[in-house]
């Protein structure tokens, strides 16, 4: 499996817009890829978000990304997303990982396992 992790800061009063954008982006990505995304909001800094997405493999991701990036709606949504970033913390960090393994406790109940 292939994992992408993004970190960024969203203006605290624009979180609803952020979530709406992410929902639209997910629908577009879903046309091309199978994926699972988790959005984490820091308990210490309400503006800090981490986005973790798991894909089947990097090759499938790279091949699909070519088509996704040609979609005008994706370009427009990315511009909208950038407008939600904090002015003084407008950087988006991105890192790639290979998924190695996971462990799960049977006592933890959640919506979906990552």
Language model features with spans:
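A beta-strand edge to alpha-helix "cap/lid" segment located at domain peripheries
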Residues: 3, 62-63, 100
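Short, surface-exposed ligand-recognition loops at beta-strand->loop->(often short) alpha-helix junctions
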Residues: 9-20
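Short, solvent-exposed loop/turn elements at beta->coil junctions and helix N-caps
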Residues: 38-42
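Acidic/histidine-enriched, glycine/proline-rich intrinsically disordered or flexible terminal extensions
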Residues: 93-114
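An amphipathic, aromatic/His-enriched active-site/gating alpha helix that lines ligand/cofactor pockets
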Residues: 24-37, 54-93
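Short acidic/glycine-enriched loop/turn segments that link adjacent beta-strands
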Residues: 44-47
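Active-site-flanking beta-strand signature of metal-NTP-handling nucleotidyl enzymes
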Residues: 3-8, 50
